[in-house]
């Protein structure tokens, strides 16, 4: 668990038991009935934060009824209590999470320190802030919303509000920009106080490893990439390279090593002098063998656009690490982009850890309760549904081949469509969604994937109409409810078809959860084959396939948890160093550490930024090659932590002397400082592929086993 998480608690021990929760709920409902008798003028006196959270929630419940004409159900009030108590509330699809969060948000906002309400995209941030604004305003609370493309002044105004809706990426980029400000007035955020996380499993788990990066300046394009790409195109699977049984790593065979050495005339590919070439070859091999167009990325407008594997959407402003990004660009023969120098970086996990108060909500949290507890110190409270769930979840249908499975899916779509029921078909990729679309000739349908994600809200809004057929990637899993059209409940409601099982049970459950909202009828069925990627990767081909898949998903989730916890040990030391260096920088920026002149202040800030950027580059290089130390029997983590500590001590020791040197050389009043660069996020390679050097090391280990490098 993070050392710096100081989570707020209401009286969590007593609130844990269902009996206590029911008692609190009764008191709140009784108080709500009393408050209904108050006039608006009398009611506004309750705008101040009450001493008791139950009283405060009752006030907000009544305000919602008066302002936006929405009555809160018991389950929504229970969810609000859980979030006020610093928990993750699991509230099923269609149960009204947006409204349920408002009493908890208002409770924290009344402390006067502001609340970040983080959701998964700009659309939901804008929608929810506008929808709930009358409630907050009646309570005397201001509301802001951060959107991509806003000016610094617009952002500053939004962050000064009592409640600020935003995505974690936008908040993170603003945080990184603030840390590079040359004047205090340039900063847009105030100190973090509390965060309420919508779709908490997506933000706190699925995207937790994604680093937010701010970069500036330019480095030269990779002149080697084109030549390496041409050579890689001549390599053949099994002959020149092998892919591991899970499809996560690729490495050269002896024949492949010889082929590359002859093509480049470089001698021993494993010589230190060839490290840059070897890394470029591994990145190119990875791009060709493991990353697939219309599955992992799109090519649009002459650029590579990665697809978020969990959401099925374009991952905007996101890149792979430099070498792999360049390799994919070379593979698709698009213009190679220049790479910026990294000035600052933070993962979403570390960013959210900076909030002293934290809570959240989602429709799928229980399966990850161990990770919420061990990583964030957050308890998951499962909230019952308002109405009994009557959706029918049929057993999986198992086939020997993908071809048989796909035909069965098409047959089921036709059968349900003839009955007049709407059908939602969930697919794993853009490629799969378009393949099924092509098979449905003669059946009117809509396809939703990363190519047309801007139409998501409109397409999903029509998906519950009689006879509607919607084929979608994971995009249709969150954010927008599928409401049933007239007469659809009598026909049996929405039927959901899953065309494969995913590595995470949560993704499957999100798809199922599109049907049967708030007691509506509905059904779901998953179709799987022994040729599905999930099963092929993990060698599952037994007759009891459904049981095997369930067990496999639990094992994969446990493995991913272990990996994330292990990788946090690598990142935690850098995060502590970042906090230390930024504290010093902020003191200089705000005048806590007085300087003899404005020039000296500017030079000091620019020097800190420059040395920190150098430190990040050195740490990145260290981590990229740290796997080599295990070849000598040493522990990579221990060696990494030791070296990073020594490197940071060197940085701190250089600061004063470097500032003095640069100040002595400054002839322009300190104005010659770096300009802020562009910002982007890039795909983490911690899992599943590993770093380039890790892949090289795996190949080298195999080579040593088969023939001695030194013999």
Predicted features along the sequence, with ranges:
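Conserved P-loop NTPase motor core
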Residues: 1-543, 582
């Amino acid at each position: 668990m993070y050392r710096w998480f100081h989570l707020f608690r209401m009286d969590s021990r007593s609130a844990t038991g269902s009996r206590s929760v029911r008692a609190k709920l009764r008191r709140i409902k009784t108080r709500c009935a009393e408050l209904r008798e108050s006039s608006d003028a009398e009611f506004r006196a309750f705008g101040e934060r009450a001493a008791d959270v139950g009283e405060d929630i009752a006030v907000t419940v009544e305000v919602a009824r008066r302002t936006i004409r929405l009555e809160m159900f018991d389950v929504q009030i229970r969810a609000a209590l859980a979030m006020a108590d610093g928990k993750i509330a699991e509230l099923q699809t269609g149960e009204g999470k947006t409204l349920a969060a408002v009493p908890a948000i208002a409770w924290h906002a009344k402390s006067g320190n502001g609340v970040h309400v983080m959701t998964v995209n700009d659309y939901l941030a804008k929608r929810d802030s506008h929808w709930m604004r009358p409630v907050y305003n009646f309570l005397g609370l201001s509301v802001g919303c951060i959107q991509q493309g806003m000016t610094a002044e617009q952002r500053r105004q939004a962050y000064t509000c009592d409640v600020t809706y935003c995505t974690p990426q936008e908040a993170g980029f603003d945080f990184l920009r603030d840390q590079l400000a040359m004047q205090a007035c340039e900063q847009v955020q105030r100190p973090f106080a509390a965060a309420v996380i919508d779709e908490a499993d997506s933000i706190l788990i699925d995207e937790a490893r994604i680093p937010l990066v701010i970069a500036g300046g330019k480095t030269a394009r990779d002149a080697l990439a084109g030549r390496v790409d041409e050579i890689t195109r001549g390599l053949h699977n099994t002959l020149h390279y092998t892919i591991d049984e899970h499809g996560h790593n690729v490495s050269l065979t002896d024949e492949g090593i010889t082929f590359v050495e002859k093509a480049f005339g470089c001698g021993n590919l494993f010589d230190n002098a060839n490290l840059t070439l070897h890394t470029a070859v591994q990145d190119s091999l990875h791009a060709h063998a493991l990353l697939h167009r219309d599955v992992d990325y799109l090519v649009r407008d002459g650029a590579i656009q990665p697809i978020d594997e969990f959401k099925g959407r374009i991952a905007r402003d996101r890149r792979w690490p430099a070498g792999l990004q360049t390799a994919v660009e070379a593979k698709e023969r698009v213009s190679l982009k220049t790479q910026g120098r990294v000035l600052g970086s933070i993962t979403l996990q570390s960013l959210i850890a900076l909030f002293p108060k934290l809570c959240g909500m989602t429709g799928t949290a229980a399966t990850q309760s161990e990770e919420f507890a061990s990583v964030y110190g957050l308890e998951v409270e499962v909230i019952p549904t308002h109405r009994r769930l009557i959706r029918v979840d049929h057993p999986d249908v198992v086939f020997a081949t993908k071809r048989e499975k796909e035909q069965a899916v098409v047959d089921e779509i036709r059968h349900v469509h003839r009955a007049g029921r709407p059908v939602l078909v969930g697919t794993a990729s853009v490629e799969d969604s378009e393949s099924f679309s092509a098979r449905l000739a003669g059946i009117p349908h809509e396809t939703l994937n990363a190519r047309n994600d801007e139409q998501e809200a409109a397409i999903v809004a029509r998906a519950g109409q009689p006879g509607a057929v919607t084929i979608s990637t994971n995009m249709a899993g969150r954010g927008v409810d599928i409401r049933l059209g007239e007469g659809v409940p009598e026909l049996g409601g929405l039927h959901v078809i899953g065309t494969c099982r995913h590595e995470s049970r949560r993704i499957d459950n999100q798809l199922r959860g599109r049907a049967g909202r708030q007691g509506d009828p509905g059904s779901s069925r998953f179709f799987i084959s022994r040729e599905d990627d999930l099963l092929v990767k993990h060698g599952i081909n037994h007759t009891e396939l459904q049981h095997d898949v369930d067990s496999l998903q639990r094992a994969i989730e446990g493995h991913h948890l272990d990996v994330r916890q292990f990788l946090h040990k690598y990142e935690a030391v850098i995060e502590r160093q970042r906090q230390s260096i930024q504290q010093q920088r902020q003191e200089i920026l705000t005048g806590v550490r007085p300087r003899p002149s404005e020039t000296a202040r500017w030079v000091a800030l620019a020097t800190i930024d420059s040395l920190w950027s150098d430190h990040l580059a050195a740490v990145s290089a260290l981590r990229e090659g740290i796997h080599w130390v295990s070849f000598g029997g040493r522990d990579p983590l221990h060696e990494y932590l030791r070296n990073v500590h020594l490197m940071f001590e060197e940085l701190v020791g250089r600061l004063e002397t470097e500032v003095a040197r640069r100040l002595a050389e400054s002839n322009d009043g300190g104005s010659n400082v770096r300009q802020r660069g562009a910002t982007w996020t890039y795909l983490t390679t911690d899992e599943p592929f590993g770093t380039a050097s890790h892949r090289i090391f795996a190949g080298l280990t195999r080579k040593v086993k088969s023939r001695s490098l030194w013999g």
